[in-house]
């Protein structure tokens, strides 16, 4: 058995990136191993599963346990080179028979969250935070194994993640109303490095929860400083705060199809300059501030011609902001207006009122439109 995993790549630009496996794939493999041992007394190791797109990965077992009427198997999650907070966590499945006719029942063990709010794919109250695709994968594999041995698929499957409650504090589960641990996630079973699909999934689920709660106003911020500034104005409930970060497009495109009355986007000057330029992914590796664009904004705001070269040669957007502020020129307001136009264009007429708040590094509001 192998109970270790290689740390996620800390320098992805210097090496070919490795894909990894979702918590859902690990839970499915652990469940297959546990059920097989429950029936036969032997744990398959490694254990292979078929993923939704046909891949057949094999997983080494990090934990085995066989007792009277139950079996347990654990797999250490390898997220490849994705910066995933669950990388290295042990996903444990405990399987035991359920009363005849009950089918397959999922339960949250230690470190796996419980859903408490409406709007998520798993209905509350008290349901284990195991998403639909992992549930289906585990159900199908259990039904196939039971059919092979001529047994009814009446089982209780408890998924546990030691330390999961602490890991969950690094996620948005508490704001989504998922308490006590992490979620068991995945749609393909594969984690693609830096694809950010889990982050965008969190954004979508946050919007779903807010809509289900009847919330009319949500906030997406690029970071904690701008979030705090907006919250000082509105004091929105935690479930109204979306995990936006750099993914303005993830918020806007989902709201296009699932509208909420009002959206406030709050961010630092540089991030919202990129949104004003039309970028929807605001990460520094995927969009850059265009100094020429900033000069156009400054020129329209009244900046003198002799400032053009200084703006074009500036190292950062904040340097441009400070240059214009030093002569009493406001470019934060025009940037906010342009950012709002990008947001409205992306929403394509969806009934969402958009507000933009631009802050400086200290959280002072520079513009609000």
Swiss-Prot record:
Pathway(s) where this gene product acts: Cofactor biosynthesis; adenosylcobalamin biosynthesis; cob(II)yrinate a,c-diamide from sirohydrochlorin (anaerobic route): step 6/10
Keyword annotations from UniProtKB, A to Z: Cobalamin biosynthesis, Methyltransferase, S-adenosyl-L-methionine, Transferase
Organism domain of life: Bacteria
Xref: SUPFAM superfamilies: CbiD-like (SSF111342)
Reactions accelerated catalytically: Co-precorrin-5B + S-adenosyl-L-methionine = Co-precorrin-6A + S-adenosyl-L-homocysteine
Disulphide bond pairs: none
GO biological process: anaerobic cobalamin biosynthetic process; methylation
Keyword Protein biosynthesis: no
Single GO MF descriptor: cobalt-precorrin-5B C1-methyltransferase activity
EC number: 2.1.1.195
Entries under Gene3D superfamilies matching the protein: CbiD-like
Family: Belongs to the CbiD family.
Name by which UniProt lists this protein: Cobalt-precorrin-5B C(1)-methyltransferase
Taxonomic path: Bacteria, Pseudomonadati, Pseudomonadota, Alphaproteobacteria, Hyphomicrobiales
Gene that this sequence comes from: cbiD
